[in-house]
Amino acid sequence: MIDITLPLTDIHRHLDGNIRAQTILDLGRQFNIALPAQTLETLIPHVQVTSTEPDLVSFLTKLDWGVKVLASLDACRRVAFENIEDAARNGLHYVELRFSPGYMAMAHQLPIAGVVEAVIDGVRDGCNTFGVEARLIGIMSRTFGEAACLQELDALLAHREKITALDLAGDELGFPGSLFLSHFNRARDAGWHITVHAGEAAGPESIWQAIRELGAERIGHGVKAVEDRALMDFLAQQRIGIESCLTSNIQTSTVASLADHPLKTFLEHGVLASLNTDDPAVQGVDIIHEYHVAAPAAGLSREQIRQAQINGLEIAFLSDGEKRALREKVAAA
């Protein structure tokens, strides 16, 4: 189902949601951190979704073991590097990795700006080693409140030239976008792109808010957009992309089944929706699974899957020249 003549992208992929179970074991042993299991086989149920979670917040607890072992900046650098290695193994040509530096720093009180620098270094080294092209998106974890998000923003802005965009993720219902207007004003002033997790746990009004108040150019998940025809029209007309994550939305109980997922409707409506993983290690999936298994199960035709692949590059945070160069590189391979 993947068109090998086109660039393969993953533009909604959490770096801190893609920490290998083996790496969690390794770092746990290195730093004498008590883990819930001592073998890879017995650890996996604690760090990977093995059945549908009742809600988004329950799903997010599966991520916690990955960051609990980040006891040094070198550990952060390692998982960033491994994220690029994983992308290369999946055949990705271009990936946008998003990460919450405050979340990664929290368990061991690491310097947040140091975490940002370590991630930048690890991704750079990975790209140089494996030939994948990548951009970084900084996340503010809304669940921790406005002040904590301000700390994350300051740390990201200290390395603003290496960050491409700002995102807001976490508890969408408890911490609406309206709390973070000044944060996004600063991000836009820095020249960053804006993407926002919206319409995942909350309704279409959250997507409208992300666009109108926060300046979102893309929406993460956005499944509730299907409930508002005017919003669907607006997304299509204004070319505001939807970063769809099929398997993730089932595992978080955001959508009841793949057959009920709105991605097919988005594509039929002309919305620039793409296929992405979200948290690959936690979900136990990769981009190949999303194209070959999840997308057909969601009712997408071969041509719609190809369109989603095209959309992934179309809405990527790259210049027109960078997109053209990537298309030419893949076509010539």
Curated annotation (Swiss-Prot):
Catalytic activity, EC: 3.5.4.4
Gene Ontology biological process terms in this record: adenosine catabolic process; hypoxanthine salvage; inosine biosynthetic process; nucleotide metabolic process; purine ribonucleoside monophosphate biosynthetic process
Matches recorded under PROSITE patterns: A_DEAMINASE
Cofactor note: Binds 1 zinc ion per subunit.
Residue numbers marked as site, Important for catalytic activity: H221
GO cellular component labels: cytosol
Annotated keywords: Hydrolase, Metal-binding, Nucleotide metabolism, Zinc
Binding-site residues for Zn(2+), renumbered to this chain: H12, H14, H197, D278
Gene3D superfamilies per the UniProt record, alphabetical: Metal-dependent hydrolases
Catalytic activity annotation: adenosine + H2O + H(+) = inosine + NH4(+); 2'-deoxyadenosine + H2O + H(+) = 2'-deoxyinosine + NH4(+)
Gene Ontology MF: a single term: 2'-deoxyadenosine deaminase activity
Residues binding substrate, per UniProt: H14, D16, G170, D279
Active-site residue list: E200 (proton donor)
UniProt cofactor(s): Zn(2+)
Homology family: Belongs to the metallo-dependent hydrolases superfamily. Adenosine and AMP deaminases family. Adenosine deaminase subfamily.
Family matches, as PANTHER family: ADENOSINE DEAMINASE
HAMAP family assigned to the protein according to its UniProt record, in alphabetical order: A_deaminase (MF_00540)
Protein name: Adenosine deaminase
Designated gene of the protein: add
